Curated annotation (Swiss-Prot):
It is found in: Cytoplasm; Nucleus; Cell membrane. InterPro entries: Metallthion_15 (IPR000316). Belongs to the metallothionein superfamily. Type 15 family. It comes from Arabidopsis thaliana (Mouse-ear cress). The keyword Membrane applies. GO terms for molecular function: zinc ion binding. The lineage of its organism: Eukaryota, Viridiplantae, Streptophyta, Embryophyta, Tracheophyta. This is Metallothionein-like protein 4B.
Length: 85
């Protein structure tokens, strides 16, 4: 299995990190917090198997509108729990 980096700041792919689930990269797919690289901005994560996390917390279209979820933007038709929070 490929090591994806620092395991302490990673999580499995799911709607909470914005990666497709199941991830096309299999079990090696993880979301890493960019807080170290971006100087503490914890709302944005990157996924080796996808694009940016945080701004698109579920598998909704990237044509997003602001929602009440903390730091999240989701498409109009998005109904995942992360967007509803």
């Amino acid at each position: 299995m490929a090591d994806t980096g620092k395991g302490s700041a990673s999580a499995s792919c799911n709607d909470r990190c914005g990666c497709p689930s199941p991830c096309p990269g299999g079990e090696s797919c993880r979301c890493k917090m960019m807080s170290e690289a971006s100087g503490g901005d914890q709302e944005h994560n990157t996924c080796p198997c996808g694009e940016h996390c945080g701004c698109n917390p579920c598998n909704c279209p990237k044509t997003q509108t602001q929602t009440s979820a903390k730091g999240c933007t989701c498409g109009e038709g998005c109904t995942c729990a992360t967007c509803a929070a």
